[in-house]
Amino acid sequence: MKTGLCLHGFQEKPVSGSPEAIVNDSLRRFAKIVQMSLPTSSSDARKVEFERESMSYWKMQHRASAQSVNLVQRPSGAGALLAVTDPRLDRRIGGEPVWLAQNADAIASHLEAVLGQRVKIRDAARAGFYVKLETYPDIKAPLPGELFDWLRPHLTSESYSQLLSWFGESCSIVSRWIALELPGDAGAPIYCLNLRDRSLAQNKAVKLGVRAGRRVKAKFSNPDITLSQSAINILDRAEILSRDRNSKLDVLASARVIVVGQGSLGAPVALHLARSGVGHLTLVDPDQLTASNLGRHVLGASDLGRNKAEAMCARLRSDVPIVTIKAIPSYVELALIKNREDFEKADLIVVTSADWESEETLWRAKSVGASWKLIQAWSEPHALVGHALVAADVSADAKSLFEDNGRFRHKYTNWPRGDSVPLPACGQSFIPGGGLGVSAIASMVAAAAIEQLTSDSRDILWISRISNPQRVSALEGEYVGPELPDGATEMTLRRPWPEVFPNA
């Protein structure tokens, strides 16, 4: 939804529609401009309108910088920022951004997560400055020599003094950045100015801090600068999750979840939990990624041969850097012993391994007083039906809902040829199912996990997702589950556990 009039049009979006609609839209914008220009118009309304779009107007006057900026956490106040680049990212993401932070350790930790290897910062330059604007500067962007006069009325005297000191101390650096946080509450937009020595080629990126023992410096103590604008991304929790209006994000930040199984179901569950703001994830899986996994796994060909838990750990650290993630490349039966502290601290365990020995082990621990909540989730063959058993109660035990071989007693599909496809290896098999169906079941499981982490519910739940059950017969199976309402192709059911049977 557009929040302002945006008199110049919506970014660079092409105009579409009928000729009449385009002309009417242009006339409407022109009429608004005329109305706002009249002596009788409200100066306050005009001021608010232009302030709302101030960044748009500044960007129209400043060319884009050759380098974007990644700000590692939003600073709490005005001050200098250290700047680092890493040439390895140039090959990985098609450009070499500048990483800004108040201290070098924050940048090093962040780059280590992104690159998957330790980064040594040798000489971080104080090439950035962060400041909060008290009021809005004029929408007419300043010339380089007018920058400080343009900013001065809109900064506190202390912030302005700090900015001048930083500018003088950093004048030997050929490319610098000033991050201007707009007026308003915490989390206001940031406009980033790039101050570059005029001797630099227009599209030349500078390298700072990593691998080079020296920083690039200007030839003169008072360089003649140019002004451009750098795209800026704030890589902190508040910004990354800013479009999720879940009121329980603070609760999720401290939550600890262990996901047992990083296959086609467990991996997307872990990804959903990370992107939902769960603060601490531990991933458990002993297996390696193979080519046959790629059709329905979130990992790709570059991870073939790697342990699934370790590969997903690296993937999530890179993609969602606000989450603390640990990999345990082992069977959960061993992890319960060797990594006991991780399980003792856990709030929730989600097991998606489709391995009855590991599932039974966790139910046994749950039945004798383990404090963590437990969700066992799996898909029936061909991923048209998925289930999750949720246990919040300390002494819950679902083992009796399964036969001795781990087959669920209340399944919704029957398959004369068997539930799994054997592989040419000792005891190895897989449950057939496409990536689309598994992904939908993963969303159901992740939603159940978030609910358990953010509520005080002590209920035991059986959640099932059913999709296109008519396809079961086409796949030579039999559907024996509940009928869907007329016109529905999918359905999710929530109810207490089914009747408990004693194990045979």
Functional labels for PLM-detected ranges:
Residues S199-V257:
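N-terminal charged helix/coil linker that caps or initiates catalytic domains
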Residues E49, M55, K59-A218, E344-L348, ...:
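Glycine-rich phosphate/adenylate-binding loop
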Residues R245-Q288:
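Glycine-rich adenosine-cofactor-binding loop
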Residues D25-D44:
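Ser/Thr/Pro-rich, low-complexity mucin-like regions
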Residues I258, T282-V284, I328, L348-V350, ...:
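Hydrophobic/aromatic beta-strand patches that form the interior of the parallel beta-sheet core
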Residues M1-L7, A21:
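Compact alpha/beta protein-protein interaction domains typified by the UBC
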Residues P286-P321:
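Glycine-rich phosphate-binding loop and adjoining beta1-alpha1-beta2 segment
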Residues C313-D347, S353-D355:
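A structured beta-alpha segment of the ubiquitous adenosine-cofactor-binding alpha/beta core
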